[in-house]
Amino acid sequence: SYLGGQQVAGPSAISERFRGADSTWLSVVPAVEPLSGEGEGEARLRLLGEPLEARYRGTTLTLLLPGVSEALLERARRVAEGVYLARDLVNEPPNLLTPEALAERALELRALGVEVEVLDEKAIAELGMGAFLAVAQGSENPPRFIRLRYAPEGAKARLDLVGKGLTFDSGGYSLKPTESMATMKSDMAGAAAVLGAFKAAALLGLPVELRGYIAACENLVSGRAYRVGDVLKTLSGKTVEVMNTDAEGRLTLADALAYAEREGAERILELSTL
């Protein structure tokens, strides 16, 4: 099945990269059902199996894909580029991928024709995003609200994407245990998926309008951090009493979703690690 091929392709490519070869030739024979019926699925699987650390290892991987046209291979490559972006962001250490750094990565999409605007802490406060700001206030790294728009001429539909953007989540005063905190550099995976989707859509020239919203911040412990028992006012005008500071994603997303609704969203895809 296609899923079976997907499960096999990744590990085989991953194991290959640790064998120390200067170059590798990989001949791909049809082994899975392609998405398009012409080999695109096969090509995409092999492309996604490419090691993330290839830029550090200097290994050359040559793919031999019989029966796959250049056009289909190029389409698969463009999809994979979006996945690579999301993967790289999720794996960045939190001392490097701060909210501001995530915003800078989003701004790079302007080169592909994506409209990107980044709001600082003052602008966020002026909007009235009290829940988002409460989560962010415990960190020395200021929050950023990221707005994206991909609107090709003749777009046939609109989809709004909202991604959770916690670049690190300690749990706040409802502190996580160490073993649970170890993966919290990836609590911005929803935001990474949004940015990856915009990159892939722009590269593919998809005939759909996309709008994206990311509330990027950190949830840390400090003398300024929000507390259990605090009452917060959200962008929608509703108030929330905090009973657990480790439920921060619901607060940041509440403001981001309310903003999407204010911008006229009718179909929203929300992406988060909760």
Language model region names:
Residues E126, E140, A191, E248-L253:
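Active-site glycine- and acidic-residue-rich loops that bind
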Residues A106, L159-L161, L175-E218, G249:
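Alpha-helical metal-binding/catalytic segments enriched in His/Glu/Asp
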Residues R87, A103, L107, F145-I146, ...:
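Predominant activation on well-ordered alpha-helical scaffold segments within soluble catalytic domains
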Residues L206-L274:
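A glycine- and small/hydrophobic-rich beta-loop-beta segment
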Residues Y84-L89, A157-L161, T167, G172-M184, ...:
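Glycine/charged-rich beta-loop-alpha catalytic/anionic-binding loops adjacent to active sites
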Residues S1-T167, G264-E266, L271-L274:
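N-terminal hydrophobic/helix-forming segments and targeting peptides
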Residues E92-L96, M184-M188, M243-R250:
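Hydrophobic alpha-helical scaffolding
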